[in-house]
Amino acid sequence: VLHRCTGEAPVIICCHGLFSTMNSDKFLKIAETFAPEGFAVVRFDFGGCGESTGDIADTTVTSRLEDLEAVVQYLSGEGGLTGRYGILGSSFGGYVGLLHAAKNPVAALSVWATPCDMLSIAGNIPKADMQKLKRDFFIDARRYDLLGAVAGMPSVQVLHGASDEIVPAEQARLIYQALHDPRDFLLLPQADHSISQPSPRKQAITASLAWFKKQLLPGC
């Protein structure tokens, strides 16, 4: 789903988490907030999630990178866009977004509740969810070194809940420490993994909007 704004605009691609969808309240609110501020916003479902085709059991880091690359390719043929794009990724969506940015010209990123080591947090995810995935997910995940991929990467904002029950805040700090300026770090007190409470969520959206304006909109 492409939310357009008035005039030519940079795009913010929203990448949802491992078992989430593009229609989560979080991403609907992000699109609603960003579009009037000079951004086109894209929401999409990774394969096997929400309205997409495929089976969640076939999900891997590699498959999600391929899905994201397909979205970027699609946008390159759309009119009314500047060609510059940012990524706002939540949890596994942030992980995938960072890996994509390591090999592609992403202008800026904001990653929420994002792990630096997917395998280390698997035990914190509900067992019923993890059982939906094949062994291939874990084999594929071992191929990727997120901290190595983002070492020296600029223009990334890291947001994390201090009460995240899935991804320890220390993983967010490790990501931030690996980055290069300009970068930003925001720890949200009392916020959970989904940043589900109204006040922290509003704070996160406001902070991300300000970050993307600074990085992508001249004069802001």
Question: Where do the PLM segments sit?
Answer:
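Catalytic histidine-centered segment of alpha/beta-hydrolase-like enzymes
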Residues: 191-204
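Conserved alpha/beta-hydrolase
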Residues: 31-53
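Short beta-strand/loop motif that positions the catalytic acidic residue
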Residues: 152-153, 157-160, 164
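Hydrolase active-site cap/lid region
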Residues: 99-139
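Acidic catalytic loop of the alpha/beta-hydrolase fold
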Residues: 163-167, 194
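Alpha/beta-hydrolase active-site loop
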Residues: 58-79
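The serine-hydrolase catalytic nucleophile loop
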Residues: 19-31, 46, 170
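Short alpha-helix in the alpha/beta-hydrolase fold that links the catalytic acid
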Residues: 27, 168-177, 200
